[in-house]
A protein has these predicted regions:
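Short, hinge-like loop/turn segments at secondary-structure boundaries
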Residues: 56-59, 79-82, 148-149, 202-205, ...
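Active-site phosphate-binding/coordination module
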Residues: 17-103
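Asp-based phosphoryl-transfer active-site loop
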Residues: 2-18, 178
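The start of beta-strands in P-loop NTPase/AAA+ ATPase cores
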Residues: 4-6, 60, 165
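Asp-based, Mg2+/Mn2+-dependent phosphohydrolase catalytic module
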Residues: 180, 185-237
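Short, well-ordered beta-strand core segments
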Residues: 6, 31, 62, 184-186, ...
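Conserved acidic, metal-coordinating active-site core of Asp-based
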Residues: 87-181, 185, 189-197, 223
Length: 237
């Protein structure tokens, strides 16, 4: 078995409007039954994820907060991979009128319409923070922390090579971890720039696309091993 791990994004990949349908859940269970590991790699805060997805136990590990937090569903253990946001930064954002501000243990997120206010606060306070885009959202994390950070930590805990993972995503913030996987997939509703930088694009959107690729994987890994097109952003060996 070459591909022993499936690493998937949540919103826009597994989930449509925040929910995962029954067919997708059943396919994930089939993948687990095949002896493979499941990783969820999401920008969501853990509590937000729990509210919409009670089946966290399907996954061996969950990378939350866009790579800043690693969670073990079986034990409830959480491991922070980044520092919490400075209170001065949060205060400045609130004073600037950045509405819909979401603050996790490490991540800060708001609407993309407030991107300028976020940049201004980072610069004026001289903070070592970065902005990560995710469709209509802006996420703020320490420099060097993204989905690849949590993905690497999760694979290390599983003691499996990164090249043994099939990664599935849909948006800008998924580049970081898909770029490391042995095989990368964009679902049909993914942004165009992501579709140009992966090994496979599904015909189906979100959950239907995930089901499509996992069915192929369970039937045979041969098509995955052979599909190595020219990529605009070459993957690491």
């Amino acid at each position: 078995m070459r591909f022993r791990v499936i690493a998937a994004d949540y919103d826009g990949t597994l989930a449509n409007d925040g929910r995962v349908d029954q067919e997708t859940l059943q396919m994930l269970a089939c993948v687990r039954d095949s002896g493979r590991k499941l990783l969820l790699v999401t920008g969501r805060e853990l509590e937000s994820l729990r509210m919409v997805f009670p089946q966290l136990g399907l996954f061996d590990l969950i990378v939350a907060e866009n790579g800043a937090l690693l969670y073990h569903p079986a034990t409830g253990e959480q491991r922070l991979l980044a520092k919490s946001p400075p209170s001065a930064f949060l205060d400045m954002l609130r004073r600037s009128g950045a509405n819909s501000l979401s603050v996790g243990r490490c991540i800060v997120a708001t609407l993309r319409s407030h991107e300028a206010e976020v940049y201004k606060a980072i610069e004026e306070l001289g903070l070592n923070l970065q902005i990560i885009l995710n469709r209509e959202s802006v996420m703020v994390l320490p420099v060097g922390v993204d989905k690849s950070t949590g993905f690497r930590a999760a694979m290390a805990e599983l003691r499996l090579p990164i090249a043994s993972a099939v990664g599935i995503g849909d948006a800008e913030n998924d580049y970081a971890f898909l770029n490391l996987c042995g095989f990368s997939v964009a679902v049909g509703n993914a942004i165009p720039s992501l579709k140009e930088r992966v090994h496979l694009v599904t015909s189906g959107d979100d959950g239907a696309g995930v089901v499509e690729v996992l069915q192929k994987l369970l039937v045979s890994e041969d098509s995955f091993a052979m599909a190595t097109p020219e990529l605009s952003d070459p993957f690491e060996p």
